[in-house]
């Protein structure tokens, strides 16, 4: 008998990608086939994003496409937390569930097309099904967030911080390493708050007792002999402890910290930490401890009430801090966000656009200057793409999809997933160019 086929669309952030991997793993264990095409599938699952208006539009467009090409559609994810928005336009979807509603998604699939599975056939590898390339994987350590940033509705969509016990996280990490993963990208909504909700619950691991705590997690992952990269780190004081592990080469000297802005006034309106002078002193301290440290961050321009003075303060902070990687978003009003009700003046779209271009130009200058310093150095690079003797990879300074790459020429064919030493010969605003040695 032919196994039922599920087509799957995963939208949004890496956290949503991990949710998709979990759902697909459950479906495969029950005998469902996963298809890349809507046509011919028994049902389509769309894992949506609902954070920004642009993301909501993309989610609705994907639902529309799935309905036209297939007709049987199950919707899950963040946009599913607001089912009326979906039902008003697409009343014929089979089911709508919110984020993290794994069991509800599986039940909806069972209703649409019951599973057929030979219990003697193992369909899922120990590490589960992954949607990333085989050599790297996202490791989600918690769900939700207990911060209340005024522009964000994540706590409404996904609830307060809920950490996974550290033994569960480490078991998953170990299985991934055993499956050949070379790099773990640690993610959550608030990575450095890991374990606070569990009051740093103690677990047994390898005949030892360890705490469900950010530092302990970094230390244990650092002993697994692979690249470990930290994302979505809120700048709590205890982050300082982890810099020592980076200096000791236990985990990658890379911190993804979403600073969002530099103006104290804007940061207070955002309900974010507003002591950027103190943050600058901490960055200086971090770089003294770990000179190889790379900082990545994201920023928002055009937040309601942002003045020219506020924006210029952001540009000055960029020039002073000289962070290696920075992304910038033009503010979009998010339905349900507190920022909508602050009574602040909205910034015209043309002003937002101008500020975004000025921000990006400033960061390109900084990045160009910093990358030139890599010329002549030899870097360890993990290969992401290969066309024989020409390849692309990433050094410790770059996360997949959001940062730059290293373009490589080689005398021998290079394989995806292998580490190569590369001598850097050129650079531009974002990327490096070199020869495998």
Swiss-Prot record:
SUPFAM superfamilies: Radical SAM enzymes. It catalyses: L-aspartate(89)-[ribosomal protein uS12]-hydrogen + (sulfur carrier)-SH + AH2 + 2 S-adenosyl-L-methionine = 3-methylsulfanyl-L-aspartate(89)-[ribosomal protein uS12]-hydrogen + (sulfur carrier)-H + 5'-deoxyadenosine + L-methionine + A + S-adenosyl-L-homocysteine + 2 H(+). Residues 4-114 form the MTTase N-terminal domain. It is found in: Cytoplasm. Keywords: 4Fe-4S, Cytoplasm, Iron, Iron-sulfur, Metal-binding, S-adenosyl-L-methionine, Transferase. [4Fe-4S] cluster 2 binds at residues 145, 149, 152. Binds 2 [4Fe-4S] clusters. One cluster is coordinated with 3 cysteines and an exchangeable S-adenosyl-L-methionine. Belongs to the methylthiotransferase family. RimO subfamily. Catalyzes the methylthiolation of an aspartic acid residue of ribosomal protein uS12. PANTHER family: RIBOSOMAL PROTEIN S12 METHYLTHIOTRANSFERASE RIMO, RIBOSOMAL PROTEIN US12 METHYLTHIOTRANSFERASE RIMO. This is Ribosomal protein uS12 methylthiotransferase RimO. It comes from Bartonella tribocorum (strain CIP 105476 / IBS 506). The gene is rimO.
């Amino acid at each position: 008998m032919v196994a039922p086929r599920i087509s799957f669309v995963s939208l949004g952030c890496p956290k949503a990608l991990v949710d998709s991997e979990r759902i697909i793993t459950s479906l495969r264990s029950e005998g469902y086939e996963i298809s890349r095409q809507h046509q011919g599938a028994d049902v389509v699952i769309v894992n949506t994003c609902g954070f920004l208006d642009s993301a909501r539009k993309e989610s609705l467009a994907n639902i529309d496409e799935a309905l036209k090409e297939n007709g049987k559609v199950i919707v899950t994810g963040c946009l599913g937390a607001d089912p009326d928005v979906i039902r008003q336009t697409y009343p014929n979807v089979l089911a709508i569930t919110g984020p993290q509603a794994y069991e509800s998604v599986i039940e909806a699939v069972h209703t649409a097309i019951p599973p057929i599975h030979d219990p003697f056939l193992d369909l899922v590898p120990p590490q589960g099904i992954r949607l990333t390339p085989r050599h790297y994987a996202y490791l989600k350590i918690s769900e939700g967030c207990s911060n209340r940033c005024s522009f964000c509705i994540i706590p409404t969509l996904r609830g307060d911080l809920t950490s996974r016990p550290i033994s569960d996280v480490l078991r998953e990490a170990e299985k991934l390493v055993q499956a050949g993963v070379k790099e773990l990208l640690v993610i959550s909504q608030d990575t450095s708050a890991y374990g606070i909700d569990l009051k740093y619950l103690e677990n047994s691991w390898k005949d030892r007792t360890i705490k469900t705590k950010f530092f302990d997690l970094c230390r244990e992952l650092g002993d697994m002999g692979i690249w470990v990269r930290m994302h979505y780190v809120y700048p709590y004081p205890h982050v300082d402890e982890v810099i020592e592990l980076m200096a000791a080469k236990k985990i990658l000297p890379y911190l993804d910290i979403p600073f969002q802005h530099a103006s104290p006034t804007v940061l207070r309106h955002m309900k974010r930490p507003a002591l950027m002078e103190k943050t600058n002193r901490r960055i200086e301290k971090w770089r003294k401890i770990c000179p190889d440290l790379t900082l990545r961050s994201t920023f928002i321009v055009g937040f309601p009430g942002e003045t020219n003075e506020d924006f210029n303060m952001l540009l000055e902070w960029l020039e002073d801090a000289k962070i290696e990687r920075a992304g910038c978003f033009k503010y979009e009003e998010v339905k349900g966000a507190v920022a909508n009700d602050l009574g602040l003046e909205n910034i015209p779209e043309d002003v937002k656009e101008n500020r975004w271009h000025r921000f990006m130009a400033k960061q390109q200058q900084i990045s160009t200057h910093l990358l030139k310093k890599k010329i002549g150095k030899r870097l360890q690079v993990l290969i992401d793409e290969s066309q024989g003797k020409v390849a692309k990879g990433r050094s410790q300074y770059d996360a997949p999809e959001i940062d730059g790459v290293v373009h490589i020429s080689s005398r021998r064919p290079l394989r995806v997933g292998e580490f190569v030493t590369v001598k850097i010969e050129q650079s531009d605003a974002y990327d490096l160019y070199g020869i495998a040695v």
